[in-house]
Amino acid sequence: MKLILITTALLQSLLFASFSGNIVDKNTSAPIINAIISDSIISVKSDENGSFTIDTNETNIHIKAYGYRPYKINFENNTTNLKLESITVKALYLTFWAANTTSKRIKKILNMIDDTEVNALVIDIKNEYGSTVFKTSFEQANSYGAHKNRTNRDIENFMQLLKSKNIYTIARIVTFKDELQASNNPDYAIKKIDGTIWRNHDNMAWVDPYDVRSHEYAISMAEEAAKVGFDEINFDYIRFPAKAGLKFCETNNQENRVKTIGEFLDLAQSRLRKYGVFISVDTYGNICWSNDDNNIGQTVLSLAKHADYISPMLYPSGFASGSFYFEYPSEHPYAVIYRSIKNIKDRIDSKRVRPWLQYFKDYAHTKRHYRKFEVREQIRATEDINTSGWMMWSPSSRYHLNYFVKEDE
């Protein structure tokens, strides 16, 4: 028996090696507390001195810390003093149709990045219809023809171009709204009470978030984005439809909805751990002013527990007349952003909030055009409330360079 125990201990020591290090800010050398150090199986956190030890036999070790670029440990450098580069993400949305090296839109945006504060892009990888921007190795999606409308025929070269400019890359994955997946799998599509597939106003079907097959599908797609080198996975439509009278495979109540979204994110964190990517989730802007799940399965507290960043869509035009005591919230872009984020600081550190900002005409009230003043006021609010940055939503990905040049530059 003693020999067996000694042999077991010896095998464990041979199989698992301890790696220790210290994580500091690249510019200030200050220790980074609660950084997440992961191999494909386990994660540990750095202590108050930025120190950590991880027992692993793997050579790919990744570090994530809020407000920093992801970091991959290079064992060839034989260093234990690990310096992370801080980043305040300032991102533009890049539409599905422009996400390739030859589009005129991407060329203009890359020139803009060279000359402005913009340092990141949110890129459609799977859109609302279910189409993928490049042909992945995910055979289930390919069997549905998800790649047929792809606009990027050389994703490796595209990613290399972005990395050469030190652009922080965010892969947008539309999660449960997926016409292709739902129409090819009617057994787990969201149904109307009569049993037929429900489609919303744009004639798009959704898959049932309660069915784990919908989780596997979206996370498999996220893995494809992680494999080609994205820094972050952004899950959009990671919610239940905001509509009553639909049929699901489980009892549809707040407890079950919130639990289901949490389980999805836990699985995503587990499966994506080995790639070292951050996970962000998109939410309605009114999540900042609500304590319940608004019938869609999202609360600030529940998302903060499972995701790295939350991205409320704080479009001033999306708030009803009378919100914030303003007749027209769209005329007060600074106040809408600042007050909304301030209202959730007791539930999540503002450094883990990166809102979507409005870069389109007011559609709800005064039809006000959002030009440089409105854009800069929104950005100023994110700076004053100390968020992790911002993401600008222009549905067409058309942007003006001078909107993103600070006045003092």
Regions found by a protein language model. Give the residues of each.
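Short, acidic Ser/Thr/Gly-rich low-complexity loop/linker segments typical of extracellular
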Residues: 30-31, 41-54
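Aromatic-lined carbohydrate-recognition surfaces of secreted/lumenal glycan-active proteins
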Residues: 168-178, 234, 257-296, 337, ...
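A short, solvent-exposed loop/turn motif at the edges and junctions
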Residues: 62-73
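Short, ordered, surface-exposed loop/turn motifs in non-cytosolic proteins
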Residues: 19, 27-41
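Glycine-rich, aromatic-flanked loop segments that form ligand/cofactor-binding clefts
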Residues: 120-125, 151-199, 234
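Substrate-binding cleft of secreted/luminal carbohydrate-active enzymes
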Residues: 307-319, 330-337, 343-344, 349-409
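Extracellular beta-sheet/turn segments enriched in Thr/Pro/Gly and aliphatic residues
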Residues: 74-90
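Active-site-adjacent "subsite" loops/lids of carbohydrate-active enzymes
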Residues: 87-101, 160, 176-224, 376
